[in-house]
């Protein structure tokens, strides 16, 4: 008889909550491991968007309780892609999901993979008529059994962590006196998180920056706006666009009590070029540059 190992599963998916998928997965876990509580991180990742799921999981990983982290954004469900469980943090946690890059950034932030196993043992799975609901049939039972104290080695063959698929988080790059960045995430308030932190900004830059939004090849060309570096939304009075240090230590394009994404036409994946400006007063009007 195994002794319980964990009492928490933190759960992230693209399932949404309109259908029964989330509830069924949680019910399977509760049935097999009644002592376990399931914490919903989010189930509103855009369908099939592995990158968005990996970024959300990376934002969460430093704050989740010790235990199992179950993430499912799985457009390749039912194919030869592997279902995996990865031990991290000296055994204090297990990160579980499809081997499609979803888990890689979070695993790296947790200190890297210590052991990894493919979930293939049918003794720890549910019998199913089809292969399209791995969350219910493979991941939920595995999460419950791990919480009950079953060693990962019982769930399937060990996998060399170096063979796991990497994530696809873009890096900023310098282009002369400019910094080419990308929008990683737009939150529900319309703040647009960039893939840069304050230390990535050029040391010669002051408090004012130029934002070049989009690419010349885009249908609407490039929109140019002035932004000011700020520590709170309240500093962005008079309609100023801000570059605010967000709660994850990244810089975000923001407005005060308005959606920067809507007003500036910005979405996840958009290119934003940052250019340093002389610190002058005033708020610039929008300028659009397009290819003739």
Protein language model features and the residues they cover:
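A C-terminal functional module that forms or caps the active site or interfaces directly
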Residues: 195-249
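Alpha/propeptide regions of enzymes that mature by internal proteolysis
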Residues: 2-13, 19-73
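Generic structural signal for well-ordered, non-membrane alpha-helical segments
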Residues: 18, 22, 50-54, 131-139, ...
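ATP/nucleoside-binding phosphotransfer catalytic cores, i.e., glycine-rich phosphate-binding loops
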Residues: 228-292
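Short, solvent-exposed amphipathic alpha-helical segments in soluble enzyme
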Residues: 25-30, 87, 112, 198-202, ...
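Fold-independent oxyanion-binding glycine-rich loops
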Residues: 13-15, 41, 72-75, 88-89, ...
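Anionic-ligand-binding alpha/beta catalytic cores of soluble enzymes and soluble regulatory domains
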Residues: 126-205
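Active-site histidine-anchored catalytic micro-motif
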Residues: 8, 32-38, 52, 63-66, ...
